[in-house]
């Protein structure tokens, strides 16, 4: 599937974009560690390209999957053809994760893979809290919620504090990725563009300021890693919290 996903890319961008398929082994690790989706529907929140949905479908072929994303335009237009290429059946719903168009208790289980960080960029800390609250609302009693992101575990604890959840598992996994400077510099340019788009800022000056700040921060981290490690790992480690709704 990686070859299909990157078929129109030049050799360097093929490496960068190919990370979305599997995330350096993290998606395979996550689905192996997650409990099987409950009977009924499983919701993947902020599903983006739908690569995690594909891994869920491969790992749990009988699961009834639904992916929700704020848009399926631009890069995310590949979500539907990607699922077809993967041989995975899933319904895709375009909606804001902070205001999900589902009745209470619709889903038996839910997940969010690296989606909270994008929601934070666009809608701040409050947007993340609203998303987790909505996930709880649409999750049935006894349903399982799996959250995966780069945040420290303490930040997950703060997000879940006060909610009727019992934590079942915590885990951490680094990306099996080692990039040289040429790949890293191309990646940083692409990631900066993506970050600016996620802010949804209409003001051109604000966009340019964000671009300069984010590119500078990412470049500094790249230089640090190249000096200390000799290679660049663009993200991670990814941390996972799995919790069950207790009422």
Where is each model-derived feature located?
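Class I SAM-dependent methyltransferase Rossmann-like catalytic core
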Residues: 1-25
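Conserved alpha-helix/loop element of class I SAM-dependent methyltransferases that forms part
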Residues: 20-39, 55
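Conserved Class I S-adenosyl-L-methionine
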Residues: 173-247
